[in-house]
């Protein structure tokens, strides 16, 4: 009885929050995230709720502590602010009221991630590996349709990545790369050996984020732009500029 009562109260709070948010934002709150457009200044943001599952791998010396969990999530926020937020600026044209108001203006894009024990858009499994061993590695991945992510404890620090068997190498933060997938750009642009060179038209763009580098590209916003155009009929959103 108590649980159902508490759940009903929480649902009422959620409904009120949604009502207040809808007054300020144009929203597309789907299973992959809450995409918002600020009605006043045109700023675009993507809110992601992550439900973490912390796992100790065989080579980790100790299990996750609460301090380490909080530090990891704090570094997630730091990485997003340093490498994604306010680096991409969109704009809009078209015949809608919104497009008329913001035609040609810079519209900032940002990502916000909050951790939650309920209503998680994404289930995020983080494996603790041996951070002191340079050879300790676990392949990170996402399953888009299931909104499932696997990371490891080294994904918040830069590591050398090389393009196939060539000598082209760059430093990359794994989390930064995985966020590109999470916002809807599903292709990996790198290749693992010389035989794979033709698998993507962007395999030679080694400095790009979805390859082995850290630089953003306008093409990574395709899914976001498709959602924005559906949210505001009569509008044509596009990437205006990208800070590398």
Question: What is each residue range found by the language model?
Answer:
Residues 38-40, 117-121, 201-204:
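Extracellular/periplasmic catalytic domains that process cell-envelope and extracellular macromolecules
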Residues 70-186, 190-194:
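Metzincin-family zinc-dependent endopeptidase catalytic domain
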Residues 51, 129-130, 212-213:
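Active-site-proximal beta-strand/loop segments in catalytic clefts of secreted hydrolases
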Residues 6-22, 26-47, 53-112:
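Zn2+-dependent metallopeptidase catalytic core
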Residues 53-55, 132-136, 217:
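Short acidic, S/G/P-rich loop/turn micro-motifs used as interaction or catalytic elements
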Residues 45-48, 180-182, 208-211:
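Structural recognition of the beta-strand scaffold that forms the well-ordered cores
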Residues 150-170, 192-244:
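Metalloprotease/metallohydrolase-associated module, dominated by Zn2+-dependent proteases
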């Amino acid at each position: 009885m108590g649980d159902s009562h508490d759940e009903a109260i929480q649902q009422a709070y959620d409904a009120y929050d949604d009502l207040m948010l809808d007054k300020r934002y144009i929203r597309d709150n789907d299973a992959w995230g809450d995409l918002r457009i600020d009605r006043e200044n045109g700023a675009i943001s993507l809110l992601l709720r992550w439900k973490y599952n912390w796992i100790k791998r065989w080579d980790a010396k100790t299990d996750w502590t609460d301090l380490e969990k909080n530090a990891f999530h704090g570094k997630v926020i730091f990485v997003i602010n340093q490498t994604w937020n306010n680096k991409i600026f969109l704009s809009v044209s078209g015949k809608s009221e919104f497009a008329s108001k913001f035609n040609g203006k810079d519209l900032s894009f940002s990502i916000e991630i909050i951790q939650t024990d309920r209503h998680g858009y994404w289930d995020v499994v983080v494996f603790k590996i041996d951070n002191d061993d340079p050879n300790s590695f676990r392949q990170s991945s996402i399953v888009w349709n299931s909104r499932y992510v696997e990371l490891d404890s080294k994904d918040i620090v830069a590591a050398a990545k090389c393009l196939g068997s060539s000598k082209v190498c760059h430093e990359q933060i794994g989390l930064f790369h995985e966020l590109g997938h999470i916002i809807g750009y599903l292709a990996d642009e790198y290749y693992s050996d010389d035989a794979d060179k033709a698998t993507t038209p962007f395999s030679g763009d080694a400095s790009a984020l979805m390859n082995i580098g850290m630089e953003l590209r306008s093409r990574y916003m395709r899914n976001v732009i498709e959602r924005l155009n559906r949210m505001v009929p009569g509008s044509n959103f596009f990437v205006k500029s990208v800070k590398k």
